[in-house]
Amino acid sequence: MESPPQSQAGLARHLHGVLAELHRQPYPHVPNPPACKKRAAVALILRIRPTYDHWPSSSSTGDSSSSLSTEQRLEEFFAQPWVQHGEPEVLFIKRASRVGDRWTGHVALPGGKRDPEDADDRAAAIREASEEIGLDLTTNDCISVGNLPERVVTTSWGSVP
């Protein structure tokens, strides 16, 4: 079997390492300041696009057992030849264009404001991805690895000093 080009094989290997490290070393939770009641969350959704020369077999379509640990699921996924030859992609959305909306037309990660019924930021990101793009991130073919760095974002949009 032919080995993948160095750039693709290296990229998949490095992506595997980064995701495994993100899972092992999650970023700490950053609480909201007392005066800030709103909170938002986004989902960084990555996929590996197979190349035409290395298409996945029908048995490698994400049937990974949910009883495996995240590390095992990552190891199993990145061990597949089509993944090693594939091209990583990030999902971005383009927000709707609306008059008066400060985010109008922006390119962004799927996500949005946390609702009271959301248990945590992860739940908010999962719900928002489902609402915005119809992608269910709770299925077995999705591997939830960890959280991105949290930060407090403040704005004076529309306020008068």
Model-derived regions, located:
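N-terminal leader/linker segments that precede catalytic domains of diphosphate-processing enzymes
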Residues: M1-P161
